[in-house]
């Protein structure tokens, strides 16, 4: 292992605090868990300096940057870096490539706040490439098992019980179906990739060389499973989790009605929260309108509206079971049956929760 790789590995295995001095727009496109953004230049300043660099060259761009970030603005930014460094003496600073921006930030921090602080060699690019390589290497070197099963069997909860489980839905902050959007939205594609790679890295450090993932397909919401991993999973053996129809419906009611409504009410209050919960549920069904067909969609939409009206009036959620049962029976279960038939020979085990847990714990250390 190269020395730089050893340092990057240490950063992610030990959750080293990271100070990101890139512009906010860059940070939003992708960073690392726990990183804090205190930029050298804001988005507008970065845009101006970039134009100057392209038109007049580096010396003029540096001079413009010094002019834009001066006086009170400069003092404020140095104060933010100093506060981070004092709170996290074990941390590191990075910019895009470990170049001018991090050099300038560290020079100012040292000369005006008296703080010598280390930076990440190669910056964000080096950190990201290390994580991309981690996922690609795991896809080539490790064993994988896909956990499949009908909608509502509790696959995600089972993954959470496995030391070697990789929770794609957790990293994507999405439950994976048309109804899977969560209140606080999804991470960027880059952030999703980073979270997954760090999870793999930490589990490998604990000795795991085989992993179990839920059978999600190419996407979890708008997050795409990394190509190297997706190609590896297309050849992975499949374990199927089974449960009764009634238990599956109750689990879906708990996740998508009780739990989701509670999240919206906690965030927005009873009235607005229920209104937004209702809108989210109806919009989620609307995403399936074309696949369901006109008559079936209209019936489910009417049933959902009736269930929401009763829930709002009395708190009774029983009517939700009707549209959920119909949607599962007439849409999700046939779709699962079709997908299963398209992958003959890959299913290596089927059973209920205790049986599948025992099988995976015994065979996927």
Swiss-Prot record:
InterPro entries xrefs: P-loop_NTPase, Rhodanese-like_dom, Rhodanese-like_dom_sf, SelU
SUPFAM superfamilies documented for this protein: P-loop containing nucleoside triphosphate hydrolases, Rhodanese/Cell cycle control phosphatase
GO annotation, biological process: tRNA wobble uridine modification
Rhodanese domain mapped to chain residues: 12-136
Active site (UniProt): 95 (s-selanylcysteine intermediate)
Keywords (A to Z) from UniProt: Selenium, Transferase
Listed EC numbers: 2.9.1.3
Catalytic reaction equation(s): 5-methylaminomethyl-2-thiouridine(34) in tRNA + selenophosphate + (2E)-geranyl diphosphate + H2O + H(+) = 5-methylaminomethyl-2-selenouridine(34) in tRNA + (2E)-thiogeraniol + phosphate + diphosphate; 5-methylaminomethyl-2-thiouridine(34) in tRNA + (2E)-geranyl diphosphate = 5-methylaminomethyl-S-(2E)-geranyl-thiouridine(34) in tRNA + diphosphate; 5-methylaminomethyl-S-(2E)-geranyl-thiouridine(34) in tRNA + selenophosphate + H(+) = 5-methylaminomethyl-2-(Se-phospho)selenouridine(34) in tRNA + (2E)-thiogeraniol; 5-methylaminomethyl-2-(Se-phospho)selenouridine(34) in tRNA + H2O = 5-methylaminomethyl-2-selenouridine(34) in tRNA + phosphate
Catalytic class of the enzyme: transferase
Membrane-crossing segments per the record: none
NCBIfam families noted in UniProt: PRK11784.1-3, tRNA_sel_U_synt
Subunit structure: Monomer.
Reported function: Involved in the post-transcriptional modification of the uridine at the wobble position (U34) of tRNA(Lys), tRNA(Glu) and tRNA(Gln). Catalyzes the conversion of 2-thiouridine (S2U-RNA) to 2-selenouridine (Se2U-RNA). Acts in a two-step process involving geranylation of 2-thiouridine (S2U) to S-geranyl-2-thiouridine (geS2U) and subsequent selenation of the latter derivative to 2-selenouridine (Se2U) in the tRNA chain.
Protein name per UniProt: tRNA 2-selenouridine synthase
Organism annotation: Verminephrobacter eiseniae (strain EF01-2)
Phylogenetic lineage: Bacteria, Pseudomonadati, Pseudomonadota, Betaproteobacteria, Burkholderiales
The encoding gene: selU
